[in-house]
Curated annotation (Swiss-Prot):
Keyword Ribonucleoprotein recorded: yes
Keyword list, A-Z: Ribonucleoprotein, Ribosomal protein
GO cellular component, one term: cytosolic large ribosomal subunit
GO biological-process terms attached to the record: negative regulation of translation; translation
Entry keyword Membrane: no
Name of the protein: Large ribosomal subunit protein uL13
Assembly information from the UniProt record: Part of the 50S ribosomal subunit.
HAMAP family given in the database record: Ribosomal_uL13
Pfam family, one: Ribosomal_L13
Length: 141
């Protein structure tokens, strides 16, 4: 019996509106779409997921006290260079990175995960330059 390897020829584009949607709920939906876990022929060693375009990133909802309690940290590489910012500051400066950070934490951490990063396109406003790909809208429950 030969091993079945599914074809990876179907590249779908999906648009998700993030306005008023909780960040974790949005990130889990996006991560599973990028990995391709919604497909009946899901194969873990192949990248079969969709391209996901996220709109209205600045209007994403953070429940509870997470706007002030959630802290993003990064290290500059220099001594004493640990930089922190709250979720409120991050949403004000660069709202795209908040969604990207949440989604990338849910993707695999190897070579495939890094190539899956290219399938996520996040925009702060309502417009996007991917209309030529004819993306389908996806509702978040």
């Amino acid at each position: 019996m030969k091993t079945y390897i599914p074809k990876n020829d179907e590249q779908n584009w999906v648009v998700v509106d993030a306005a008023g949607v909780p960040l974790g709920r949005l990130a889990t939906l996006i991560a599973s779409r990028i990995r391709g876990k919604h497909r009946p022929d899901f194969t873990p060693n192949l990248i079969q997921g969709d391209f996901v375009v996220v709109l209205n990133a600045e209007k994403v909802a953070l429940t509870g006290n997470k706007l002030d309690g959630k802290v993003y940290t990064r290290y500059t590489g220099y001594q004493g260079g640990l930089r922190t910012e709250t979720a409120r500051e991050a949403l004000a400066k660069h709202p795209e990175r908040v969604i990207e950070h949440a989604v990338f934490g849910m993707l695999p951490k190897g070579r495939q995960g890094r190539s899956m990063h290219n399938r996520l396109k996040v925009y702060a406003g309502e417009t996007h330059p991917h209309t030529a790909q004819k993306p389908q809208t996806l509702e978040v429950r």
